[in-house]
Amino acid sequence: MDDSEKDFNLKVVLVSFKQCLTDKGEVLLDHYIAGWKGLVRFLNSLGAVFSFISKDVVAKLQIMERLRSSPQSEHYASLQSMVAYEVSNKLVDMDHRSHPRHPHSGCRTVLRLHRALHWLQLFLDGLRTSSEDARTSTLCSEAYNATLANYHSWIVRQAVTVAFCALPSRKVFLEAMNMESTEQAVEMLGEALPFIEHVYDISQKLYAEHSLLDLP
């Protein structure tokens, strides 16, 4: 994984999520992984405050990269082919076991990325639409409470809420996107977020159809 922050540019994320979707509405996992790598570089560029999320995302991306380079890689070309393959071959733990048989299944791994993507999508949209003096801690907490908080323990939720208090200003966030100006960053977010949202919506629908949204 390339964790260099200096190469981050919002345009790279936009291109990755654009290329993620085929004309048939399939989600191509190589581009999905590439888009997430860009988002991780963005989070890491802001310091340790997001490390609790970025470290977990990096671990999940590594699992997906191993699946993409495995002998079964053809089944992991798209989200749709992965779900069809793992569900039909019973490679997904559908019930809560003390010792899951498939803790690193693609479906379970992408579900964790899917949930984190929803949080980041809502937070970035909050940055895009908020005023210059908006409190990023509030924006981030609201996005977190609507998404990831539903899957975290009370202790984790409290620790995360405290960590968000150390977030930099909206201006710093926008400057970290490495555009020519904060105005251009806002404009680019407006172009990128619909693609991210579309990928999220397609994934959500697919997982719901196969009863995969509550995988342990």
Curated annotation (Swiss-Prot):
The family database entries (Pfam families) matched by this protein are listed as: GLTP
List of residues binding an N-acylsphingoid base 1-phosphate: D56, K60, R108, R112, H152
Q: Which InterPro entries does this one have?
A: GLTP_sf (IPR036497), Glycolipid_transfer_prot_dom (IPR014830)
Protein origin, superkingdom: Eukaryota
Q: Name one GO biological process term.
A: negative regulation of autophagy
Could you list this entry's UniProt keywords, alphabetically sorted: Cell membrane, Cytoplasm, Endosome, Golgi apparatus, Lipid transport, Lipid-binding, Membrane, Nucleus, Transport
Q: Which reaction does it catalyse?
A: N-(hexadecanoyl)-sphing-4-enine-1-phosphate(in) = N-(hexadecanoyl)-sphing-4-enine-1-phosphate(out); N-(9Z-octadecenoyl)-sphing-4-enine-1-phosphate(in) = N-(9Z-octadecenoyl)-sphing-4-enine-1-phosphate(out)
Q: Give Gene Ontology CC terms.
A: cytosol; endosome membrane; Golgi apparatus; nuclear outer membrane; plasma membrane
- Give this protein's Gene Ontology molecular function annotations: ceramide 1-phosphate binding; ceramide 1-phosphate transfer activity; phospholipid binding
Localization of this protein: Cytoplasm, Cytosol; Golgi apparatus, trans-Golgi network membrane; Cell membrane; Endosome membrane
How does the record classify its membrane topology?
Answer: Peripheral membrane protein
The protein's job, in short, is: Mediates the intracellular transfer of ceramide-1-phosphate (C1P) between organelle membranes and the cell membrane. Required for normal structure of the Golgi stacks. Can bind phosphoceramides with a variety of aliphatic chains, but has a preference for lipids with saturated C16:0 or monounsaturated C18:1 aliphatic chains, and is inefficient with phosphoceramides containing lignoceryl (C24:0). Plays a role in the regulation of the cellular levels of ceramide-1-phosphate, and thereby contributes to the regulation of phospholipase PLA2G4A activity and the release of arachidonic acid.
Q: Which family does it belong to?
A: Belongs to the GLTP family.
The name under which this protein is listed is Ceramide-1-phosphate transfer protein
Specify the taxonomic lineage. Eukaryota, Metazoa, Chordata, Craniata, Vertebrata
